[in-house]
């Protein structure tokens, strides 16, 4: 059953649909109130005029679907699948900053508090995010002073002979030394910290008051005084929060600017009626979000809000967005259930709130100009900045970048792409079939391709590039460096860019990784070169697999050996051309018996399909 036939059989229920390419890879995930209607809309006249949607339709060979009970379930499932599968044609959130959380290590006998920007499934409890960032550190300092739960990295699985300075100055209970505290006392302190971080001030005050009274009854007046002071501190903090809340509710406000197939989004975080921080998001590949008439703003903001807020630890009571979108009420319900309180997503049309959205949109335009106009400087300036950032001995007039591609060690290939004087120089691209490596060994594969490339350069007395760039981490970088040294090339500028973290390692300074600002044109150009090497390697690898698969199919035909297979592929170019060829065309390449066998094979295949 072909794709069009399959779409006509889709149910009219709500659900999620998944487009797949020839390799079975999920390339787009979408949600729908009516699966048949939504998926069918891709194929109406004019739908593929948009280059992005057209690319999706040209690559998609299959569609799968998951039926759910309602729109709310479809929205949640779509978000989970996008985060899990990261489909190429969906917009994927790439934030330019991460906010700190406070981590309470409940998996330890003696839990501690830390400020962290990474959320892990390690049994710890996380509170936040906090912005501005220094607020998290101020809260932890308050915990040290009032609850005496530490942030140290001492091994608490064993006792030590003496406590550190923090215990002596009254900022730690001293669980590292036997006898200074016990599990009951420490457990009460941790419970207090949890109540404090969860904002349960009444429960915390009640617990502290009970302990204060008990201490007073036991004639422990110094301890009772400590509890009294702590109760006063908790009341003061609670009062300040109530005043801030009265001055203005917590809210997030969105604005955007769309131009030339690119979008800048600004998000203002308002807490207590004041703007405490802002975030920028930039999108250059909008995929299915960009319809023929421009940006599908409703679907864009629906997806954006899902990726920002679903599964987040904190969602403000009100979110203001500039446009209406279809599943706004469903998203409100999900977020309200997630936070155990009512969450509103509003689309103001007039008044102060609309003026606020317009203000955020003006900031988004400035961010757009800064990112897409100002920060795309002239080539010479860019090369100079790149030279300074990586501390290169000369201007990087030519960069050669390598990437390895395989699936579980099969059909391993490599690519080399070239950036020269501000442009990708496709005429100098090279493809390599890895010959000496068996199985999965990216390091050995990198050594082979670098050796082959630059051994030839040396033999032909050609100049080396200004920079050799490797797609990978420190391991791949060392493999490339070892290959160059083995053929007598020293002092060659060499760097690598690690995936996901986008950290740059320079050979000889691996212990000083370079973290470049996300808005920097230097990072953009390195990412562009790296992504092009990856694309080129993936494309070559797919073609190799297709050739292998075609070869296997032809070799299954009785009487067709390797020589006949090679002649057929060389003459017709593709399996599809062979499949549609007539007897006369086939007999120009193979004998009559072989031609008849080929015709019979594809005739039987067609009968099976129908």
From Swiss-Prot:
GO cellular component, one term: cytoplasm
Single GO molecular function: excinuclease ABC activity
Database matches in InterPro entries: GIY-YIG_endonuc (IPR000305), GIY-YIG_endonuc_sf (IPR035901), GIY-YIG_UvrC_Cho (IPR047296), RuvA_2-like (IPR010994), UVR_dom (IPR001943), UVR_dom_sf (IPR036876), UvrABC_protein_C (IPR050066), UvrC (IPR004791)
Entry keyword set: Cytoplasm, DNA damage, DNA excision, DNA repair, Excision nuclease, SOS response
Domain UVR: 202-237
GO term, biological process aspect, one: nucleotide-excision repair
Localization terms from the record: Cytoplasm
Keyword tRNA-binding: no
Keyword DNA repair: yes
GIY-YIG domain: residues covered: 12-91
Family to which the UniProt record says this protein belongs: Belongs to the UvrC family.
HAMAP family, per the entry: UvrC (MF_00203)
UniProt function note: The UvrABC repair system catalyzes the recognition and processing of DNA lesions. UvrC both incises the 5' and 3' sides of the lesion. The N-terminal half is responsible for the 3' incision and the C-terminal half is responsible for the 5' incision.
Binding partners and assembly: Interacts with UvrB in an incision complex.
Protein name, UniProt field: UvrABC system protein C
Species per Swiss-Prot/TrEMBL record: Koribacter versatilis (strain Ellin345)
